[in-house]
Amino acid sequence: MGPDDPAVPATAPAPAPAARPVADKTMTMRDAIAAFVHDGDTVAIEGFTHLIPTAAGHEIVRQGRRNLTVVRMTADIVVDQMLAGGCVSKLVSSFVGNSSAGSLGELRRRIEHALPEPLEFEEYSHYGMVCRYLAGAQRLPFYPLRSYAGSDLASVNDGIRTVTSPYPGPDGQEERIHVVPPVNPDVTIVHAQRADRAGNTQIWGLTGVQAEAVFAARRAVVVVEEVVDDEVVRSDPNRTVIPAHAVDAVVACPRGAHPSFAQGYYDRDNAFYRSWSHISKDPERLQEWMQRWVLGTRDHAEYVAMLGEEHWAGLAVGDALSLPVNYGRRL
Amino acid sequence: MNAAASATAPHAPDGASTAPADAPATVSADGPATGSTDGPATGSASREPVTSSELLSVVASRELAGRRTVFAGIGLPTLATALAQLTVAPEVEIVYESGVCGAHPSHLPETIADAVLITGAEAVLSMPALFGYVLQGGHIDVGFLGAAQIDKWGNLNSSVIGDRWDRPSVRLPGPGGAMEVMANSREVFVVMRRHTPRSFTAELDFCTSPGPDRALAEGIRPLGAGVTRVITDLGILARAGVGEELRLVATHPGVTAEQVRAATGWDLQVADALATIEPPTASELRLLREDVDPGRVYLR
């Protein structure tokens, strides 16, 4: 039946579709990591300087996962912590530094001195990593980009190759272009401001590469500042960056992105970023830090409490509300 | 763990090496004197000695005349672009690697992802849009890059120091988006705080971000001209594009071409008409100190 079907009077209201049952995918962090991160897995952890899933990284350390391949564009403090926790045997990344605040001590020891053991490292550029996720999300065999011509990176990374375009270039000549392979992580973990219980995930501010990383993965865990009612999500569907069907677990973990930030929730802990170079420089001091803040805490709530309310007050942000948009409704 | 960070003020230092100094270091402490203290400066702000950060920011800002879109990281490029907005290039817009376009920050951002860049911004893009559409799509006039090493063709190393990539003596952060900035910006400006033979080298330990000459050697033509300006504590090197070496085109007052050649690891060519860089003016210094970075977050 269609709108032109004479059997349906034009004035009859369309019947409301039957309500689809909403799956509840909420889990504790402990259960989600236990269920979706296994020894030897390839684990993508994304969040470009914003919404970094640090608390999830800590829980992976607590549960003692081993031989992980970690995929992350900006391998920063959370990766250094997972290295210090002995979880990682291979890293795939495009930036291995502590933001602009200094060095990652454990990562440098692993790469420069193979201490306490070697780290297999596969290096791309930022857009190379983005393209790997894009290819992975779309189940494409490769993805072309104009980044690597003349770079020594292609000589140390067999994944970076060239193809000849089947079409002539702008000058009518044959055109060669670099390509990168897809990445399909066993699991991708991202952090977001909010999601509903089914996993419709809303992010604002820097949205980075989270959606691509989730769609590239076989399983996805979304950690959020808060789980909100279905109506909250449905009041602004364009804010949903990741739809529920791509999500396997929703973990409520307030302040779980520290020391990075959650736009509108808390600010970046810049002092902590600066202190990390000093903490991680000395392996003993680093292991003491891991013992106290990660292995010595039961969960992220304990880590948050240990930081103290005074600390959190220093990271508090004021309101800057967006103006609502009108989605309209059928009269 | 450290004391809480504040979004509104420079942080208490947790280590002397990374702390912004309360009082600016004078240029003479870590670079050549610029003559600014007895130059044409007349405003009260300009009576203080000019720091190397101020000098490099001012010189870089002048190079942005006529440019519209600048891809910049935090630090000197941000200062230079913000100053250019108040002087030679009022219409210039910064695009940040985090995806922010048209930022209107309430406070000077401390990182490319500072929350103050997002609140009130004109647009925030995803990574595929930023790198794919904006950069690779050819929307950037000038990309600012830094590096540990640069060679005479403007190729850059930000990956490793040492012979072996897989066992370097120093592992640096790596490419990030630098290769994309190099390949796709119309031109690239490099700011180097210290002009030394180790950083201005005949042969890079590793070529992270290749200029167009290296790309062409592989038979692939990149979009942009590569590095066209290198601004250092000694002067300015420039090249127009493919097939050209970097040449010394200007020096700061009191710096000779021979000094710069001695500080360069290759046989540096010198322009016939070698210019002397005008020291920062009173007005430029006042804008930089009072409007752009009053908290002296970067002007150290």
Q: What are the language-model segments listed below?
A:
Chain B
Residues M1-A5, L108-T276, P280:
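Conserved phosphate- and dinucleotide-binding cores of soluble alpha/beta proteins
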Residues N2-R47:
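Intrinsically disordered, low-complexity terminal tails and inter-domain linkers enriched
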Residues D22, D38, A80-A82, I161:
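Residue-level recognition of conserved structural "scaffold" positions that shape functional pockets
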Residues G43-A121:
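N-terminal active-site beta-alpha-beta segment that forms phosphate/nucleotide-binding
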Residues L64, R68, A84, V88, ...:
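Structural signal for hydrophobic packing residues in well-ordered secondary-structure cores
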Residues D272-R300:
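A conserved C-terminal secondary-structure "cap"
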